[in-house]
Amino acid sequence: KKTDTLSGGQKTRVALGKLLLTDPDILLLDEPTNHLDLNSISWLETYLMNYNGAVFIVSHDRFFLNRVVTKVIEIENGALSMYMGNYRAYSEKKQQIRDAKLKEYFNQQREIKHQQAVIEKLRSFNREKSIRRAESREKLLEKITIVDKPQEAVREMHFSLEPYCVSGNDVLTVEHLSKQFDTQLLFQDVSFEIKRGEHVAVIGDNGTGKTTLLKILNQVIKADNGSFTLGAKVQIGYYDQEHHVLHDDKTIFEEISDDYPHLTNTEIRNTLAAFQFTGDEVFQVIHSLSGGEKGRVSLAKLMLSEANFLILDEPTNHLDIASKEILEEALNNYTGTILYVSHDRYFINSTASRILELVNQTFVNYIGNYDYYLEKKDELTQTYASSQIQRQ
């Protein structure tokens, strides 16, 4: 194949392959896990952990950073800070440092107020000895190095997801679904159910049909065989990783106002401000936006939809770590039902109550998050393989 015909994941693997074959003393990797499936990421992690040279990585993949790095350098407010350990150690140490500085700040403020009260009281006596004592304390106060209050953690987006109405208990029933493109069979005769309140992650290698499944459920494309049924009062909100739900020729403001004409200009601006679009930025045309900016517009529309069944295709793509954490919080507080495709293992661990792995044209069901999946993967894969052989 020519490289210009390859997918994002295939191009990433080719670039990594060329780089690793040179066996350099230092590797400089910019978002190396982007577009890679879980098996490819696991292989890369193992390679890097056994690599003898130095590795310098820019990444938003928290699970990857936990597995691979031994030191974290953070750029914040124009300054560099260094932390020993992996991402988890960095996150914990940063919080400890902030808590200690905050405690030091409040203790100093309390002491300053106490000394100021004592000085005021001494001066109120209006005696020479008391005034000298007050002046002495004032000089000591002037020599104090003031501790600055630590800045609040930056929360760039702020939003919540709330369904307009409660759906029935049976949200989605998939029966004997099959799909193939030309000679490539994606999945065959698959059946599963999703109940109200479940947060279901779909995982699997690239090209196995995960996104295709979501498009079938959103009636973007048709299945070859089988059917699916939505339950009572189910309303779907769809997040498309390629952002086809957005209109390239519209401005951000028009994207919201055209879909939600009942909103006032102020309400639209307030909504967009929650997703970091302020002032004249709301009049940017969709086609001029970056992937992360399009993602924020799509999330804004998702919030306004008030749907009770969210179907999300790679929702953390192009989001920075702070935005991912805010999205995780919103999804964990969401009272509706979620079905999503993701390669972000940290995100899956934080938000999934169940995992469907697409492997060998069928789905393997795991009742738990990503840690549970890793624990049970070999056992359940063998069980499903045996049942498939018996069916055949």
Predicted regions located by residue number:
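A general structural signal marking secondary-structure boundaries and capping sites
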Residues: 123-126, 145-148, 279, 377, ...
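ABC ATP-binding cassette signature C-motif
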Residues: 1-105, 155-392
